[in-house]
A protein has these predicted regions:
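Cytosolic regulatory regions of ion transport systems
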Residues: 1-447
Length: 447
């Protein structure tokens, strides 16, 4: 597959990293020569130093033979114009990053398709959806639903209250057990566990289960004492904050703390003021946090444009008794630091957007894919095709790569966990967790 990426910042760089693992034919276009040189020294791709707005640039990059053209520059109009040109010059599919929520309205799909833009992506909406979903469960770091919750993956930080520490997984995760441990993040190491592995205190463990067993998982990991989120404090009043308050359940109330007075006035026009209070002030001001009821807040979400500020703000909130903290960390260099400081949930817009786009590059049998930044791993949902390798043998006979495991499957709308003796059938939606593996190595089992 030939893929052309316009824009070497944030999303473009992260996409280049993902694609380099799969040895795709990738071209990266940008006007910043130094940035291109830095990226090309790390990843196996071709670079073009030029403006993406020029037709000759697109021709030089080989857009006429492109399977996918992705425009993720910082300029929304440039992205849309580049996609229109790329489509007219022969690109099969195009994706434009937009900065306006109105542009992703499904009612506009037909219009954008006609002008040459196959898909639009609004990273702030992806981040807001992730945040709102995570706030529903105060005791979980990450949650990923398959087929509207028929299967659920939960990333949980294990504390001393966990009942299943230091026991071999072969004794815990038996075929009849209501959960599987599909991965463990321990320090800087990601483990695809086997039967002799054990869970240890401070591990970030990824559980695969069905929705009705979520309360049981909460009990065995010792999180029943965590209070459910009702009051949310958000630091930073950008687009992600606005969209997150719109997506939060109706039983939650939010306070947005924003430093810029003019932005506060705009926020009062954008949010539901019955559930959301806008406060003009500095979210780093401890007296302000106390005055606004930080001690009665169950979740603190830091969404400023500064990763350091967000991390420090979450640390402060934790010291004031807030259990659920969420930090927007756009600089990947800070992610490991935030993890080591036990910040809580980390949201990275470019990783979410890159995962969303990455799914478009895979075959139609890949329904969903999620890059788990904390574990440096992917979790993907595949549809088993008639006659595919995965349907011809039981799971233990498939010979999956050692850094991949099948967590569960959905058949006729019902979720099931998978054991070695499970026989996957054509049409099943199968969840695969893999660490540092070319996705193409997994795809071939399902074709």
């Amino acid at each position: 597959m030939k893929i052309i990426i316009a824009g070497a910042y944030a999303i473009g760089t992260h996409l280049a990293q993902l694609l380099s693992r799969n040895n795709e034919d990738t071209v990266l276009i940008d006007s910043d020569e130094e940035r291109l040189a830095s990226i090309s020294s790390e990843y196996d791709l071709m670079t073009v130093h030029a403006s993406v707005s020029k037709i000759q640039t697109l021709k030089d990059a080989g857009v006429s033979g492109a399977d996918l053209f992705i425009a993720v520059t910082r300029d929304e109009n440039l992205n849309m114009n580049a996609c229109m040109l790329a489509k007219a010059l022969g690109a099969k599919r195009t994706v434009a990053k937009v900065d306006n929520f109105e542009y992703i309205d499904p009612k506009l799909d037909g219009f954008f398709e006609k002008v040459g833009i196959s898909s639009r992506i609004y990273p702030e909406n992806l981040a807001a959806r992730d945040i709102a979903n995570g706030l529903k469960m105060s005791w979980v770091r990450q949650r990923w639903d398959v087929h509207d919750g028929a299967l659920v993956m939960l990333g949980i930080k294990l504390r001393e209250t966990c009942e299943i520490l230091n026991e071999p997984l072969k004794d815990l995760c038996k075929p009849e057990s209501p959960y599987h441990i599909v991965a463990i993040k321990r320090g800087d190491e990601t483990i695809i566990p086997r039967g002799d592995d054990v869970l240890k205190i401070y591990d970030l463990a990824y559980f695969m289960t069905t929705r009705n067993y979520i309360p049981y998982i909460r009990k065995i990991v010792g999180k029943e004492h965590y209070v459910d989120v009702k009051n949310v404090m958000i630091m930073g009043g950008g687009a992600t904050a606005v969209r997150a308050t719109e997506l939060m359940p109706e039983y939650m109330n939010a306070k947005i703390i924003e430093l810029d007075e003019a932005r506060c006035q705009k926020l009062n026009e954008l949010v539901d003021t019955d559930r959301v209070m806008v406060i003009n002030g500095d979210g780093r001001d401890l007296s302000l946090l106390n005055e606004e009821g930080i001690k009665n807040t169950q979740a603190f979400v830091a969404l400023t444009g500064n990763a350091e500020t967000n991390i420090l703000a979450c640390m402060t909130a934790k010291r004031h008794g807030v259990r659920k903290t969420v930090a927007m960390v756009e600089n990947l260099d800070y992610v490991s630091m935030a993890e080591s400081l036990d910040i809580g949930t980390i949201v990275n817009k470019k990783a979410l957007a890159a995962s969303y786009i990455y799914q478009m590059m895979l075959d139609a049998d890949v329904n969903n894919i999620r890059f788990l930044m904390s574990a440096n791993a992917d979790v993907a949902e595949f549809t088993a095709q008639q006659g595919s390798k995965v349907t011809r043998k039981k799971v233990f006979e498939l010979g999956l790569p050692k850094d991949a495991t099948i967590g569960g499957l959905v058949r006729h709308g019902e979720g099931f966990l998978v054991s070695g003796n499970t026989q996957i059938e054509a049409g099943d939606s199968v969840v695969v967790f893999c660490h540092d593996i070319h996705m193409s190595k997994i795809e071939k089992f399902f074709k």
